[in-house]
Structure formats: C-alpha cells, structure tokens
From Swiss-Prot:
Keywords from the UniProt entry: Cell wall, Secreted
Gene source species: Solanum lycopersicum (Tomato)
GO cellular component, one term: extracellular region
Protein name: 35 kDa cell wall protein
Protein location: Secreted, Cell wall
Principal place of residence: secreted
Domain of life: Eukaryota
Amino acid sequence: ELQLNYYTKSWXRAE
C-alpha cells in the first residue's frame, strides 16, 4: 500500500 502512496504523490507533483 505504501507504493501506491508514493505513486500518487509523484503524480500530483508531476501534474
């Protein structure tokens, strides 16, 4: 579940 959190953070930052 931690990986998902990391992905979401990256997405928000990339967008």
